[in-house]
UniProtKB/Swiss-Prot annotation:
Substrate binds at residues 15, 37, 64-73, 125, 186, 195, 215-216. Catalyzes the decarboxylation of orotidine 5'-monophosphate (OMP) to uridine 5'-monophosphate (UMP). This is Orotidine 5'-phosphate decarboxylase. The gene is pyrF. The active site is at residue 66. SUPFAM superfamilies: Ribulose-phoshate binding barrel.
């Protein structure tokens, strides 16, 4: 894998406090990472201007709002996300087959081939078997992840968000063309933070991840550009 292929796999999580910081990171990294992730906190604070700021720098956006509501509401929200010009958007697979089908159909109908790719969140990387048990799910994490990934594929979703530990299982169950976006990726120079099911960038790519969501190891670095370059180095070295 060459450096350009490796950098395109990196999604930088914009866990920042406002437009000025978005502008700074987008200016620094738009030609060094594949995409920028905008999540609930940032979008709630800054709204669509967060997306517009990244796009002004030529960056691509993963809008990570994890929609989970009645089918019609989620479909309308997904359409609004698509109208912002994002490349990836997601919802919770636990919302069920009808919710996912309705959203996927609505976006395909309005945008066709120019649509964003739609992802379903399986089980959050902070979750454990005990987390699931306490909400009444008595199946192992890995089993639930694969079950939800297969449901998402059946519903017409383009891929899933899942921990790196389940990449291989999802790839086996859902095939080579199903997108896998994985948080919980930590380069060798970074701490584990609050993620429970983690993996190194090169291991995740070898397992079959299409995109790696990485935030704090880049944002907390004294030199974010150098941090990205080090992550690219790890991917290239581990994925010849």
């Amino acid at each position: 894998m060459n450096r350009d292929e490796a950098r395109k796999k990196i999604i930088f999580a914009l866990d920042v406090n406002g437009i000025a910081e978005i502008d700074r990171y987008a200016g620094l990294l738009s030609d060094r990472v594949g995409m920028f992730k905008i999540g609930k906190e940032l979008f709630t604070a800054c709204g669509p201007e967060a997306v517009a700021t990244v796009r002004r720098h030529g960056g691509q956006v993963f809008l990570d709002l994890k929609y989970h509501d009645i089918p019609n509401t989620v479909a309308k929200a997904m359409l609004e996300a698509a109208r912002l010009g994002v490349q990836l958007a997601n919802l919770h697979a636990l919302g069920g087959l009808e919710m996912m089908e309705t959203a996927a159909s609505a976006v395909r109908r309005e945008f066709g081939d120019d649509r964003p790719r739609l992802l379903a969140v399986t089980i959050l990387t902070s979750s454990t078997a005990e987390t699931l048990r306490r909400v009444g799910i008595d199946h192992p994490v890995e089993e639930m992840v694969v079950r939800l990934a297969c449901l998402a594929r059946e519903a017409g979703m383009d891929g899933v968000v899942a921990s790196p530990r389940e990449i291989g299982l999802i790839r086996q169950a859902c095939g080579p063309d199903f997108l896998i976006v994985t948080p919980g990726v930590r380069p060798s120079f970074a701490s584990q933070d609050d993620q429970k099911r983690i993996m190194s960038p090169d291991d995740a790519v070898r397992e079959g991840a299409d995109y790696l969501v990485i935030g704090r190891p880049i944002a907390k670095a004294d030199d974010p550009v150098r941090a990205v370059d080090m992550i690219v180095d790890e991917i290239v070295a581990g994925c010849p």
